[in-house]
Amino acid sequence: SSRRIAAFSLIGAGMDKDFYVNGADAQRSAYTTYLTSLLTLSGLGADEAAQRVAAFYDAEAAISAASLDPQDYSNVDKTYNLFTLGELKTLLPNVDLNAVLAASGIENAERIMVSDVGALKAAAALYDDAHLALLKTAARLALLQSVATSLNQGFMDAYFDFVLGYYGVDARQSNEQIAAQQVQALLADYLSRAYVDEYFSAKAKADVEEMIGEFIAIYKERILAQDWMSAETKAKAVKKLDTMGVKVGYPDSWESCLDRAEIKSPAEGGSFFSNVIAIQMAMKQDVLAHQNDAPDKSEWIMTPFTVNACYNPSANDITFPAAILQSPLYDVNASREENLGGIGYIIAHEITHAFDNNGAKFDENGSAADWWTAED
């Protein structure tokens, strides 16, 4: 938790592990039809696109078979795998890691994290001349899937056809709904400030912070009262509560990398797609600019307009965005009892995550560490 490190992966499976083994024929058809549509919409002939997707699907299935089971992705013991650059080069003999890191703008990659080693090894076996066409297909599909909803109506229709075929839900939206979603996704920093100005107050922020402090105090009392925990483990648990970060409503700073995005109007030669790319580039450059800095634990991983809350084990903090601090869960003008019965149970729930089967594997600084005694 004291430094930022790079994470690395190769091509992977686009769907969950069970899909490739037990998925219904209709769902598989919806998925492969979608991939084929992406390739034909980008200029390939129908027959060539179908052949490429068939080979790609088989590769995905092989990688999926070697990957972690779904429940293991929340197990830090299985996903926190650090490699030196030399170790990773040995694992990936056909990948020029130095060139990849340089092209990505990553510097000083002394340690690199791999979340799914099995999937990486299976994918690495495909990185040779014999699979060059497959790798080109994978790269093309990865790019198209990442931008499909920012392209023309044909790509949008292909996506909604996939959702209908896979989930049985017609998710087609009006242009207004699509525009609202794009604003939320691309201009989240600006929308967050506008939302807070309209729907949240400093008074509410202070009130909820006080409530959280009361809950943390009660947790400490109850931990100290347990007869099954050793004094050593109790002390560390209390320390984790004492250092737990509390984020309520909105961040203290509204600085945004969006300020540096080169947005151009149609009159200036810009388009919706070019502006999407400009925003994504600004976000990427912001990440790269801070890659050698210590993690900024004041940064938020949720937007203030998100109706949710979370505990982040790698920062040891809890976050309650302004949007969840609304009626009926919370009202600054309601009684304390009403608010305790609403947002109170969510506060208690999020604090508990610090000691669940995943959170308990991180210490007060957010570092993966076994701080429990063997007996406890």
Describe the predicted segments one by one.
Residues 91-94, 106, 113, 117, ...:
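Intrinsically disordered, low-complexity linker/terminal regions across diverse proteins
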